[in-house]
Amino acid sequence: MDHQTAEALRAFTQRYCAAWQQQRNSLPRSEELYGVPSPCVVDTQGEAVFWQPQPFSLAQNISAVERALDIVVQQPLHSYYTTQFAGDMTGRFADETLTLLQTWSEEDFQRVQENLIGHLVVQKRLKLAPTLFIATLESGRDVISVCNLSGEVIKETLGTAKRITLSPSLASFLSHLEPVL
């Protein structure tokens, strides 16, 4: 496990949860995750769940992605996807407001790996350098990803070679990410 990435993710999650406590006097709340089972669910009100992060309970790797494409995934990405179960969290990095994707449950972890595999298959078909997404942007065509060759965090336009480097590492990116509610 890449401890720097795991610690940076836990620290951002703590900042995010603290922002909810300070600004809304509650745990993080999600309507999108209502009705979806997770060890993170603390309470349900109306059609929303209140959640808090929980320790990841499965093998701490995304080896299914590696096996499917016969590649080696950078260690920070293994750590990112297997540090915790949590709801997706919004944040800001420089001028980008994004939704940091998280694994909500054991079942969700399988879906996340399938989506990563699909993303990598499309990139391979288009002869693009492999990336694994970690966040979405409002545009829908752009995502925040980690380049599997360099380890850099990039903003990429899906299906194209358009990429902008945002941070030299995933740990650095997470350390500079600010919560947005």
Curated annotation (Swiss-Prot):
| GO CC terms in record | cytoplasmic side of plasma membrane
Location comes to:
Cell inner membrane
Presence of the UniProt keyword Nucleotide-binding in the record: no
> Which Pfam families does the entry link to?
Syd
**In the UniProt record, does the keyword Nucleotidyltransferase occur?**
no
- Main localisation: membrane
What membrane topology term does the record carry? Peripheral membrane protein
What the protein does? Interacts with the SecY protein in vivo. May bind preferentially to an uncomplexed state of SecY, thus functioning either as a chelating agent for excess SecY in the cell or as a regulatory factor that negatively controls the translocase function.
Q: Which family does it belong to?
A: Belongs to the Syd family.
Query: What protein am I looking at?
Result: Protein Syd
Q: Which organism is it from?
A: Klebsiella pneumoniae (strain 342)
Whichever gene encodes this chain, its name is: syd
